[in-house]
Every structure is written in C-alpha cells, then in structure tokens.
C-alpha cells in the first residue's frame, strides 16, 4: 500500500513538473517570436535591397505561374510550363550581373545541347537501329568526357561551369531518350520555349525594375574600405596616446574603439572573395553609366589587393596596443604631437582617395602635400632629440662600445655569502655580468686592471665549470628585463613609430593604383575651383 502511495506521489510530481515546463514554454513563446521578428527586421534594415529582391522574385513567380493559371497560355504551353517556374527559381539572383550570367549560361547550354542532340538523332535515324545505337553511345561517351574535362579549365570553371552542367544534362536526356521515344524532339522544343520564357522574365525583372549592379557594389566596397582604414588608424593612434581612467564609461568606450578598429581592418582583409565575385558578375553587366564606359573590374581587384597589404600594417599597428611590454606613458607623451599629426595626414590622404573614387574624379596632384613630409620630419627630429631613450645612457653606450671592441676589464670578488662574482671595473654599481658560482669552485684569478678578450673570459669560465654543478639564477621577470635593459622601454614605441612611417611608404602604391583606376574608368579631371567653392560653403 505504501509503495502505491509513493508511486502515485511521484506521478503527481512528474505531472506538475511537466505542466510547469509547458507553462514556461508558453511564456517564452512571445519572446522567441519577438526575437525572430527582430532578426527579420535587422536583415532588411542592413540592406533594404533584400526586400526589393524578395518582391521581385515574388512578382516573377506570379507572372510565370500565369502559364498554368490562364487557360490560353496553358493550352499553348501545356505541362512544360513547369520548366519556366524552375528556371525562375534557379536563375533569378540578387544582382543583375549574377542573373545575366546564370540566365545566359542556362539558355546557351540548353540551346546548344538541343541542337547537337537533334543532329545526332538525325544521323542515328539514317544509320539504322544498330548503328544508330552505337553512334548514340559513342557520342554520349565522347561529349560527356570532353565536357567534363573542359570544366576543369580555370576560365571555364569560373565563368561557364553552370552552362556546361546544363549542356551535359540536356544533351544526355534528349539524346538517350530519343532512341526509344519518337516525340522527344518535340518535347525538347517545347521545354526550350518555356525555359526561354523563364529566362526572359528573370532578365526583365532584374534589369528593368530596381536593378542591383554588382559594379556599383564593388565601387562602394572600395570606398568603404578606404574610409574604414582611415578611421581605424585614427582610433589606434588616439587609443595609444590617451590617458586611461578607471571608470565604467571609459571601459565601454574602449570596447567601442576596439570594435571600430577590428571592423575597420577586418572588412579589408576579408574582402578578397567578395571582391572577386562582384568583379566576375560585373563583367556580365551591360554598360549602364552615362558615358557607357567599360567597368574596370580587374583594376578594382588590384586596388583591393593593395589595400589588403596596407591593412596588414594597420593590424601590426593595432598589435602595438596589445603587447605585454608597453612604453610608459611619460615617454609616449613626448612623441604624441608628431605621431598624431603624421597619422592625421595619413588619414587625410585615405579620405581624399575615398572621395575621389566616390565622386568619380581624379585625385589632386598635391595629395602627398608638404604637410605630410613636414610631419615625417617633425617625428624624425623629435626622436633624434631623445637619443638616450633609444640608445641608452652614456654609461651603457660606453660599456657596449667596449664590448664590441673586445676590450673589457673585469675583477672578481668574494661576497659575504661565499659566492664569487665577476664585475666590470667601469661599472660603479657592481652589476653581475656572469653566472654566480658556488664557494668551492676554483677559478683562475684575473689580475686587477688586466685586459682580456671576451672569448678568453668565456674559455676560463668554461674550464672552471667543467664537471661542476652550477647554480643558475632565477628567471628574470618582465620587470627585471625592463630594468636590466635601459633602452627596452622605448622599443615598443619605436615599433609603433616605424609602422606609421611604413604606412607613408605604402601610400604611394595605393595612390598609384587609384590613379590607374581613374584613368581606366575615365574619371573626370580634378577641379580645384569646385573644392574651393565647397570649402567656402562649409565655412
């Protein structure tokens, strides 16, 4: 009896738990629906053209469905209208270039395959039943092998792979089916017509109703990359020299700056595949500009490649902000003004390049102005004015020079703890130069003020330590390394400054490629009077 009561109570508890879970799911359902709707809204908000493309696909499917819905069309086309629907679903892409590429590939592949299959069918009919079958089998093997091998050619694979696939499928279906079915050629003709109708509807919707040009997307992408690099450099320099305060607001602003920097150069570094795809689609697009100039897709790819190389320097500059050993802010402040000025000039050049591409005009002949050269000289003179930070103190430099010349005098002494240490007689602080050896170690004494070479000193130490157990010092920490190397605290800043100078050097290549782009794309010439008018309006 007690067992039944326990079982019943367990069942009741399980039912209560299930009911609680169901209520919890019911309460979470509105939140999930709200999240889904928010995601759908964000997709359209990021690019409103996605909404337009969805509506265009809906209209195209509605138009092609009229072949089924309207009686006159259905009597003329019949059940083959299904191929028109399939064509619209497969061919209609986001951009006009992608739709043209896929539509022409499908249309030409179907047309050529049907024509070749009709010729083979005609030869097979006039060759008899047996010879016709042999001829069809041989043709299928030859054409199938040849087309499959041609698909490995890089140019064909890049531009005509879909057309080759459609050709291979259509050719085999018609050729093999025609051997047993007499009406297959008629069916192929009807399907060819319906496929043509589907392609025509796709091109009509893609080219005439709110067309989306891949060339314009590539053009805008190049502008975005230049602007992103400019903002990224500005954020890196400002973060490197700013005073950090321990507040929640500053931590939030730092995270925003980090996101800005990451997004700035990641957009450039991850753009290769997207740029190549846009350039490939742009080749298929008609000349739709005012002057009907050919779109220089390959030059845009070259500009993107140069910007990626420039972006690697920006990544290294951002890495200077995250190194373990940092230059003290008291030293950074000494070089803040020239570095900020140089970074500002670099950003100014990148902004000018983005504006020239955006307005489709050539750059100013004075884009590398005297102010950029003056900023470089200012940074150089500022660094030269602080030689001790980069070369060490006079004492350290004298010791280093003597080491390089191979003439250093040492003496040994016994400390109170019974260890023997080597000292430099020029070092008043008595810094330990070598390893400490235990008390019972025998060392050949070096006379005071004797001059020996560094190699002889090493040989003496090596012979004295033969067969003996050494006691090594503890591993130096980061702070000890900083203290032992007087000039090391300025080395991280030296890397930062050298990267800024490297950016100036790489600007020449970027400017050359942008100017070449303007020449090929027939950009308008730079008009200084227009710039003066704009500046006056802003003032």
From Swiss-Prot:
Its main location: membrane. Keywords: Ion channel, Ion transport, Membrane, Transmembrane, Transmembrane helix, Transport. GO terms for biological process: malate transport; monoatomic ion transmembrane transport. Signal peptide: none annotated. The chain crosses the membrane at residues 57-77, 80-100, 107-127, 130-150, 165-185, 192-212. The keyword Membrane applies. Malate transporter. This is Aluminum-activated malate transporter 13. It comes from Arabidopsis thaliana.
